[in-house]
Amino acid sequence: MGSSGSMVKPISGFLTALIQYPVPVVESRADIDKQIKQIIKTIHSTKAGYPGLELIVFPEYSTQGLNTKKWTTEEFLCTVPGPETDLFAEACKESEVYGVFSIMERNPDGGEPYNTAIIIDPQGEMILKYRKLNPWVPVEPWKAGDLGLPVCDGPGGSKLAVCICHDGMFPEVAREAAYKGANVLIRISGYSTQVSEQWMLTNRSNAWQNLMYTLSVNLAGYDGVFYYFGEGQVCNFDGTTLVQGHRNPWEIVTAEVYPELADQARLGWGLENNIYNLGSRGYVATPGGVKENPYTFVKDLAEGKYKVPWEDEIKVKDGTIYGYPVKKTIHS
């Protein structure tokens, strides 16, 4: 294992570890059980190496892998909460850390499954459950999330939100997290190298546009088809990169995070306090700023009428290119 970043817990704020987990090659339920044991082992060993560690993050697909021929089968799916999350909860409690985990979740109402992330606290309680709002279509078959973008209390004065991989390419997702009070946005990903530059760019822009820290980590290594880039990244609230990992499987990227500084920027900045300025436009000329929405896409999206001008000419609107049948029934 290699490591990049900080070694000790700061007096204020918290120490985080982003695990560039090797992409799992999963063929059976036994392989999933093996990954769960490995993740738990990694929690304990990382805590032993970094006694001040308070938040450990595992990337998307680290539990169940990316076997596209089997990933929606009953054998591969998990219930949330369920036996697998109970094991993660026990490990977090034993090591006294917050943990972020990836689960491909069986739909409790039937129909297509969800791509889910959870946060477990040092008491072993699941304090956040998030379902990916924007599956990476047309590759992914997951149902779009229906839990919104929840925020929870975390270590060192943090307010945590989680997004999953492709979610982070949408500035609206990061803005929603910040608008609901998050000062730290965690992004867990399973991207291959084709979008590594865009991934790093959006991690920075999501931080800057919302005056919040972003903690992002991707799978690492080769699964026989694609190479996954790792490159764990911690961005400051001003959009600069504090720590950047490499493309090594098992690299541990650590950083000291100071949520209070993001909070102070949101309260004290005039110039570039853009999350506030969005809803208070031109407050020098107009006391309190202009509140009315000037954005057509926001209005149309809210009314369920979002449509880009070239929509009728778009070529790919279903999953047939990746072998998924066109759906005949729409699940609510």
Swiss-Prot record:
Substrates-to-products reaction catalysed: formamide + H2O = formate + NH4(+)
CDD domains per UniProt: aliphatic_amidase (cd07565)
InterPro entries, per the entry: Aliph_Amidase/BUP (IPR050345), C-N_Hydrolase (IPR003010), C-N_Hydrolase_sf (IPR036526), Formamidase (IPR022843)
Top-rank taxon: Bacteria
Limits of the CN hydrolase domain: 14-259
Residues of the active site: E60, K132, C165
UniProt entry keywords in alphabetical sequence: Hydrolase
This enzyme's EC code(s): 3.5.1.49
GO MF entries: formamidase activity; N-carbamoylputrescine amidase activity
GO biological process, any: putrescine biosynthetic process from arginine
Family: Belongs to the carbon-nitrogen hydrolase superfamily. Aliphatic amidase family.
Function statement: Is an aliphatic amidase with a restricted substrate specificity, as it only hydrolyzes formamide.
Record-given protein name: Formamidase
